[in-house]
Structures are given as structure tokens and as C-alpha cells.
């Protein structure tokens, strides 16, 4: 979400105050980077699906051809997740779509057997189940944690030096 006002005693505006004091430049490119780079990076480099097509601004569709259970196990393993929320809408996944971060509002914009994203709400899950659409909630943070890695690789191509810090997930899993 963009800043609506700046209160330098609260996050994230306090970071801006510190950067101004230290004469630090910041390029913030969350959404546009997701559109152009991150979704494709997670799909091809992290999950290993090389045959895909972009459908709209954020979503990448790809062929799976696996049972639902096999696909879930594969996704958990590749994203290094110990638990995962799923909605089993069908037994076999022929095609799937990915949107890193929070893409639940994009459900229904395309025809696939399974949709992977984060931040699915209860009623979205219920509607997907009733419409035989499988969901895999790969969590918002966990699906975007590859930002720094992918940005570093892109900057290296242009011989650009940058300090990239990793984000911290405020949630704890117990």
C-alpha cells in the first residue's frame, strides 16, 4: 500500500526520515517488479516450470499434469514450506496459474484447475471449492521472498552495485 501521509515516528515513514538524514537513495518497485520479473522468476527458477504463458499483468499459466496430492507435495518442497493451506477442487491438475503475493482477487479471470497465490480468504476458498477450482495458498511473504535474489541477478547483468536487504516476515508459525 502506498503512503497516504508521513508520520516519521511510525513505520514505514520512520525509514524515510532515516534515509533522508543519511542521504540514502531508495528505489521502490514492488508491484511493477512483480509484474515484469518476480512471478516469472518464482515460476521458472524456483518452481521449475519452464513452459508458461503470461495471462494478464500478473498471472502466469502453466501445464502441470500431476495429481493434486503430487502437485501440493512438489510446491511445498520447492518453496521449502512445512505446512500449506489448500483447497482440493479436483483430483488431477492439468493446468495452474501463479500470482505471487496476494492475488486472490484475480481468481475467475482465467480457466485453470489450480491457482497458487497468498492471502486467500475463507469465502474465496469456499467459492473455489464449490466451483471445483483447487487453491494452493503459498503465503504472501513466502511467495515474494525471492525478490532480493532475483533483483541481485538482474542488477549483476548491468554491473550495478546495490545493497539489498531481505524482508522479515512478521508472522510466526508455531
Functional labels for PLM-detected ranges:
Residues 1-174:
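Active-site catalytic microenvironments in core metabolic enzymes, especially phosphate/sugar-handling
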Amino acid at each position: 500500500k502506498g503512503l497516504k501521509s508521513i508520520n516519521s515516528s511510525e513505520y514505514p515513514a520512520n525509514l524515510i526520515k532515516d534515509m533522508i538524514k543519511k542521504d540514502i537513495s531508495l528505489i521502490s518497485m514492488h508491484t511493477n517488479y512483480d509484474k515484469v520479473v518476480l512471478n516469472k522468476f518464482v515460476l521458472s527458477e524456483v518452481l521449475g516450470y519452464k513452459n508458461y504463458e503470461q495471462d494478464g499483468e500478473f498471472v502466469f499459466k502453466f501445464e502441470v499434469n500431476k495429481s493434486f496430492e503430487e502437485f501440493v507435495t512438489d510446491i511445498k518442497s520447492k518453496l521449502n514450506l512445512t505446512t500449506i493451506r489448500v483447497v482440493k477442487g479436483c483430483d488431477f491438475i492439468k493446468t495452474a496459474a501463479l500470482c505471487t503475493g496476494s492475488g486472490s482477487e484475480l481468481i475467475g479471470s482465467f480457466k485453470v484447475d489450480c491457482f497458487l497465490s497468498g492471502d486467500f480468504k475463507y469465502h474465496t476458498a469456499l467459492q473455489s471449492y464449490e466451483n471445483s477450482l483447487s487453491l494452493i495458498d503459498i503465503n504472501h511473504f513466502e511467495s515474494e521472498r525471492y525478490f532480493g535474489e532475483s533483483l541481485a541477478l538482474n542488477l549483476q547483468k548491468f554491473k550495478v552495485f546495490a545493497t539489498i536487504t531481505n524482508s522479515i516476515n512478521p508472522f510466526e508459525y508455531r
